């Protein structure tokens, strides 16, 4: 399962990988010092791979080959692992430093020596196979930009020609059709990503600032929030499945709503007014709206996300950089006064830690993902969320521990890079995230890269 990667294991693996790399570099440097007399390729001698290290790994693993007569001109050395071309970093006679490529599933290691015309003049193969392990990567799923990653076209089209994405602040699968993924574009149109047709289309546009999508209890209608400043205008609209989610009807009124969510079991709607820090409850049966409580900060954006069990909801306070928990009272069918589970009011930073010691900078949408390691526990879900201004994806455990899952690759911050979750991948203001249980991967709305990114095991 995708979530077997626990935070401690990840940290340990990353540390070990860098230690191995450092050792390989030292060993290779030593080999270079000792191989001066045998550095050049000798066509009268055989090429031999006698050993390699490490014996197992995945994409990006640094590998050393040991043997005889490799030569030292890397432009004339070709290495394949599992039939895939490997990048040769350096060579000196009896040692060679290369990088494991993607999809090297078969694990056979072959080395060829080429002449000036690129023709093979000698070759060899290791007696033992490398054990290739699939790894979790960040990739680009949809979206293109041009002019040095500064411009994009907003258009409908097939997956390979759908332009870029404006906004990308919220993602939600249709509960009745898992091939339909909806993307909220805030001031940009809401889009439908159709996996079956492999096509991106516009669902609706024209509202001032759409922030979130949720669904009625039976999933017969979609509910969208519209963040506007008039208390007498609608703040939540309902779009029926029967209309193809094209007809917009007023549901509730109020200003400054940027978050709404239905209870996963009982179905009532909870929404906010961030201007006053208020949380409201809407009853579909009585059509009554009831104010419940205010959070400790007024005038700051926040949104509400329910745990799948319905036992509690997280209230993510974006601009004040913390996450609250509001427990659900099953007798009164209401959310109760919330309390902080991670972060601290007004304290923006990037720090992994527990509870109020953790630091975030504008947390945004999250998604609950079942963790097999928690089986039998009272809470079996981690909460993966976008940390927008830190340009990364974080994990919040049921115990309140926050760790960094992906992004900020190569000790950087923002950018556009695919690859290893922490060593290479970079985002630019990620805001929307959803976990796809069927495909066992995450999709991320990478706002300023105007793309949909994907996190999953390489295919």
Each language-model region and where it sits:
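Short loop/turn segments immediately following beta-strands, especially the blade-tip
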Residues: 238-239, 282-286, 325-334, 399-400, ...
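Conserved beta-propeller blade signature
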Residues: 180-183, 221-225, 268-272, 312-316, ...
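Gly/Pro-rich loop segments of beta-rich domains
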Residues: 65, 134-167, 197-211, 227-230, ...
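Blade-level signature of beta-propeller repeat domains, shared across WD40, Kelch, NHL, RCC1
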Residues: 428-459
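Residue-level detector of Asp-centered blade-edge/turn motifs that repeat once per structural unit
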Residues: 173-178, 215-219, 262-266, 307-310, ...
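C-terminal motif of bacterial Sec signal peptides marking the signal peptidase cleavage site
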Residues: 26-30
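Short loop/turn segments immediately following the C-termini of beta-strands
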Residues: 114, 176, 184-187, 225-229, ...
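Ser/Thr/Pro-rich low-complexity tracts
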Residues: 32-140, 156, 180-182, 333
